[in-house]
Amino acid sequence: MSSYSAQLREEQQAVSRAYDRLDALRAQARSRLDTVRAAGSHGSPTQRTERDSFATMYEDRLTQLRAVEDRLVFGRLDDVHGAHRYIGRIGLSDEDHEPILTDWRADAARPFYEATPSNHGDIVMRRHITLSFREVVGVEDEVLDVHSDQVGEASSNGTLTGEGALLASLNAKRTGKMTDIVATIQGEQDRIIRADLNQAVVVQGGPGTGKTAVALHRAAYLLYTHRRALQRSGVLVVGPSSTFLHYIDQVLPSLGETGVVSRTIADLIPGIIATAHDDPYAAKLKGERRMAKAIANAVAARERVPSHLPVIRINGFNVPMVRADIEQAIADAKRTRQPHNKARETFVRDMLSAMRNRYVERLDYEPEQAELNDVMQQLRMNDDLRKTLNLAWLPMTGEWLVDQLFAKPQQLRRFAPWLEERDIETLTRPKGSPFTVSDVPLLDEAMELLGPDPKAVARQKALDAKRAEEEQFAKDTLAQAGIGSGIVTSQMLVDNINGMDAELTAQRAAADREWTYGHIVVDEAQELTAMDWRMLIRRCPSRSFTIVGDVAQTSALGGTRSWRRMMDPLFGERNCQLNELTINYRNPKEVSQLASDFASSEGLYISTVNAVRGVPDSVKRLTLRDDSLIGDAVAQQTVELVRAYVSSDGTGRVAIIAPDDMLKPLRARVYAQLQDELDPKEFDRLDAQSSWDEQVTVCSTQTVKGLEYDAVMVVQPGRIEENAPSRIVAASDLYVAMTRPTQRLLILRTKDDEKLLKL
């Protein structure tokens, strides 16, 4: 047996021990869960509730233990005393509480990511362990102390290496799902991951620098390190699209964390899912910070004295509504600093009191309380009074307010006086039009100023009253059972009564617009407008954020071109830590260089990025005589890329990125060619794939943000630039398109297209 084989065998024993312990913990949780479930519905309500609480705990534990199956162990640290410390996805100890595996997030695991030959403490060697399912198939050693005995041992064992584990992960075929990088986190990434919670951490990085991975691993680290603080408030992850969120949705579970809310800006408000998009200029206008003033003006305009004030007939007396009374009631309501709909309660109460007093002034006697009560009832039921009070202080929903604002040009002129006529024309749309993604922050602003819909408040009050009764019943039940504290609380019993015992913080947070999170992660953050940021800050008043993006990839006209210019007003310079990632782990050097040169020539800010590997012939150009040849050429080139990079096991991804007006015909032509040239079973497999998981996709520059493919074909880049709202946006879009591949970039264009853009 070779020395290398002996090392594999040694590590297999350690890995098997970790998996055996994992299996034992799973079996233990499963056994306890089965025991709890076997008890059924027998016993008192308290006993049933306690069993349900245990069942929930065991179910959650099983979910966590199942999620860490893949690559449970991936590293080992050797110290100067000869002790081994294994690093993995979660921490494991044996029955005697002796450590088997150290959680990658623990301080004891930091040297695995941060130790260097010049700063390694008592760690002399770092070992990377590669698994295939539960079998050890590779080990690689990095000796950190060149004077230690491990140098000679690693050399003779054939395990001495540097970046093998990293390069292997980079060269692997894409699966359509982002995988974690827990085994290959680099030093500059680890320092960001472990940054303090109570600040905004901004990560600027070019394509392929691992921004998304760093953000997600930071979320997992914070949940581990600040479990108590974040467990009740939760963590929100905001991504650029539902496709992107689907792409990353297995990363946090694989790190042992499942209680995270993932949303786009479009679906951040419960009950509203915006799918329509404004044209880029309209989106820019709606994203400006001063649109908050327009919403505030629109709300304030519904707090006024109506031009016509009726006379109300009460018990034979004419009681006029007086302007001074309305002005005073409005002032009193505003002084409460409550949202509009809530403050309206004060306004209405004051007006009813004022009208009652006006009635009393007309009497020549002191009325009894019964008469005053009757007067108040008549006032509440009077249609003229109700209509006038609504005109003076209109109850509204955010949806109604925003719909009115953009349906009536005169309102835009009045409430947003800085808008020019062409701006108003751009923003005006028919009443009842579907809400756009750019409307969502405006809706949120309106909802914040207005407060809940009064009808919804009434429904919630009824539910709260019912819940209070149930909680009192729960307390009485526990008291009768002699249980005042312990594993079961009255709150848990109430949740059981309502079937909510297994409801996670994440689920509750996602359903509550006013929920405040303990931390928010924002990916592709350069695309967010000032109004988007207002909406997010509202959801995390502590301003604990992880913000990742690349200002060179900004395609939104109202997006970020300078982090400091956007971030400092939000967080303050002292509370905003700006970091920059400099190593490109995705693109071959040839692709990275081409894309960077292009972006620089277009005036984009480019982070200093060094690609870690080269791939011969990774850039290919194909120029056609005219447009008539594009369809056939794209189809044939796609077939070649599919044969080279797409596998029947579901791995490998190819993207054809083209101008919007070419997408449908190109997709039809591509799939027709694939049907002609591929094995029928293979074509049927590809053709049956959902849009989430398809291995061959034809798409626009906007839909590939944050994603990566084995091979990318960019079709007619000059046309893509020509159709963009501005040259700088076009450059950003093309930069994004060119930096998606891990192996091959093909630029296919006509001679006329070459004249539009030098590339």
Model-assigned labels for residue ranges:
Residues 1-182, 186-191, 755:
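Extended, charged low-complexity regulatory segments
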Residues 186, 190-197, 220, 390, ...:
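Amphipathic, well-packed alpha-helical segments that form the structural scaffold of globular domains
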Residues 324-519, 528-533:
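Conserved helicase NTPase catalytic core signature
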Residues 228, 233, 242-286, 447-454, ...:
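Conserved helicase motor core of SF1/SF2 NTP-dependent helicases
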Residues 196-199, 205, 232-234, 246-415:
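Conserved ATP-dependent motor core of P-loop NTPases, especially the RecA-like helicase ATPase domain
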Residues 9, 13, 64, 168-172, ...:
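Generic amphipathic alpha-helical segments used as scaffolds and interaction surfaces in large
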Residues 1-5, 9-32, 36, 40, ...:
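P-loop NTPase Walker
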Residues 177, 181, 211-215, 291, ...:
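Phosphate/oxyanion-binding active-site loops and adjacent basic polyanion-contact surfaces
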